[in-house]
Amino acid sequence: MLIDALRADFVFGDAGRWMPYTRRLLENGQSLNFIAKAHPPTVTMPRIKALATGGIPGFVDVVLNFDSSELQEDNLITQLRHSGRKIIFYGDDTWIRLFPDHFQRTDGTTSFFVTDYTEVDYNVSRHIDSELVNNDWDVMILHYLGLDHIGHLAGPGSPLVQPKLKEMDAIIQKIHTALNKQDAYQEQPSLFVLCGDHGMSDQGSHGGASISETVTPLVMLSSQIKGQKRIDYEKIEEIYQIDIAPTLSLLLGLPIPQNSLGAASPGALHGLPIRMKLHAMQINTHQLAKVYRQNVPSYKSDDNYLMYKRALGAHSEWLRLLADEGKVEIDPKHLGDKVANQYLRAMTGMRGKLASSLSKYDVQALVTGVLLLWMVLLSLLHCHVNRDIMSLEVSTGSLAVFIAFSFGFPTAHFVTCTGPNRSDLLCGIDLLRVFLSLGTYVALIILTGFIIFTTSRKTIVQYYKSLSSKTPLELFLILGTVGHTFSLLSSSFVEEEHQTWYFFMQTINLIILIKYSAEAAHAYYNPSRRKKPWEKAEDSSKGFGGSGLSNRERRRRLRQSSSSECPPETSGESSCESVNPWKFVVLSFICVCVCRILRSWNQTGDKWAHLPDVGDWLVRPEQKMVLSYLVAVSLMLVVIIQWITHQDQFYRVALAGAAIGVYFFRAANGAVHVSGMYENSNNGAKEAQAVYGLFALVIIYTFLWYIYVKMTLHQDNTEHGAYFKTFSSTLPRRVHSILTLVIMLLVRPHNIVAFAMIVLVEYFISMHLVPRMNLSVSAMTLLYVWFGQAGFYFQGNSNSLATVDVSAGYVGLDSYNPGIIGMLMAIATYASPVFWLVGLISVLCEKYVGMQDGEERYIAATYDVCFTLGLSRALPLAIYTVLAAALRYHLFVWSVFSPKLLYEGMCSVITIIFIVLL
């Protein structure tokens, strides 16, 4: 019986009081108890593989977890079938996909539809009564998902956990009682194994390497297990999850899976006669030694292998002495225990070394990918510095060689090394062949650099000049981005990356506050010499939106605007002469305070994630009313901001209706309170679908109105033309508003409040503070990227897979649809980065589209945004992939480096999609 996400403390800790029958068995000495540690990644499919094969799955199984295929590797389930055992299975359908045609009877349940935690377990339990009276099966496997789904929805502290554990305890009692009755009439006793596949983080998710995610209980029950010592919860034997496969194989008289790395638990073999126990350990050690010989070249001189040889010799000597027991005075059990200890040391030593070195990597593919990323980085740098890149002329010969090396050779090499006619010369693994193969790829990046720097010999000089002319704030944005990238070379900085972004964001906020405070003070004490906030020195390189302007043109525009109280590019849009400079000081100070509150909203990272935070306090059952009021106020705040930015009455009403729908969706889930409604919580699918319907209606309305305005536009109709420009300039802001409420629908209830604060900060930044700072478009892009990354961590995300909110993928769904689920999860996870990027485009569009030459300037600004975004992704990817490839055998490769690489890859995919849409 496997209970998904069953943490060790749910059985052995304080929560064990909710499983009274199980605890009574533990304390009466009627069970064998272990703590089984799982290797990361702690997601279901890799854990099932580990339980069945005794091996350590790779991190690619995190992706394959959503689409499991047949397991080809030797495993315990296949050995059961080959031995003629009849197996029945009920529960997570991942087992059915991994082991097709293995089960005599099955009833699979979908493991990914996390909003259901009742029906999914009932569909398993309904078969138990009938199966316990059947005698046509030998092995029954039950996989319960309800506890895992509750964790994803509400966390381990939810009031739903207690009744679920009581429900599981009642099932354990039913099965154990029935098996004890059957054993009274059977020759061989039954074995009941209770375990978990992984644990559950304090946020309710899993996938990472924290103790709460990796530590699970293993309890063995049988009519033959009696009179054990009273359990000491502080001294429970610890094993690895991969040890379960060889342990069960030996207890059931089956061959151990060929590639198992597990070592049978001595505690599980404790009840066997000493001769049988030593024989079982010999079989396990022999199997491990076979794997060891295949994977450790110097095994003959290795201490672990020599220990195995000594254990074999001691075992042989023990058997000889046992045969001469009548002639020689010996204590068979005492000597046998010494032999068992030698076997155990040999097994644990070989297991540890194999586990740390067994991973195999395609070095050629790794190097190829790294070099291609560096090519992209160099190319983007070149394009960013040389803004006339669109008219750059490259010789035909250079272009042909570049294409051949970039596409032709890698394709040919891939086909050669993966096809049936594999070439040992190109694809071998010895030093000479690897050198010949990888040397070609090194030539590839050298050629790329040669083409780039020979086509523009002044590139470095131009880039240096462009840096020297930037403002201190722009330099800080550039140096901070580069500094953050190199900070990723430290595992501690990766684990606590949120601290870097919090520091950067608050530094920007303080710079803005100091800037406006200085201007306000200057205006107060020198009213006659007040400097306009948008003006800069004449030698400034370029202002926000001034990309590519010559000094003469910039001076001309300043002269034209010298008599105006508005910025030269916003004159006519609003009345600026009456603006109080202290207004910007107040807004800047509010941003600083709000971001400090957000810093404490969700503790994340590794070292301090366990500390209590505002979110933990709000999700407590006794704080439901407080959360309800805060969610309502937050939704009202978002609606007010949207009403300020939109004049269209239909939009205003639709967005207000969507906000109400979001609240009722959370009320249906039981997260917030609505008086007289939703006495029994449900998944809120209908409420969420109503919100989706409103969004669809808004999109259709916008599209039809856009078509109508464009069709009725006449060249001589200046009024229509002006309206069309205004309408076009507001399109990104409309998308931004829809995206805002989609995010509010998907995030956890307490994060609705956090995201409302992010919306408030974005409104102040975009509409009031930054437009008056004359930042270049590239600097604006970096600033918005910084705020987006900080918001990513404000949501409670981290570089651990455990913080991914799986439940967001099922909002409004009645059935399992992997495409929609993946899209919703991506939106919820990367809500803040996407939100800020769309906000950036909204600001640029509103600024340029209404101007006389606005279309050309908007296109130029869009190119700047795309190049800067590309660089902001290519730089960390190029650096970090080198680190990940070099440290692929590091202790933290699975717990730190690999999850971060997955996050970087997914963030890059979303950024590329955004660039393509632009």
Regions found by a protein language model. Give the residues of each.
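Alpha-helical transmembrane segments of integral membrane proteins
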Residues: 356-918
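Glycine-rich, phosphate-binding/catalytic loops in enzymes
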Residues: 16-21, 158-161, 209-213
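Active-site-proximal alpha/beta segments of enzymes that process anionic O-linked groups
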Residues: 7-137, 145-152, 239-273
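A long, amphipathic alpha-helix that forms part
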Residues: 118-140, 147-204, 543
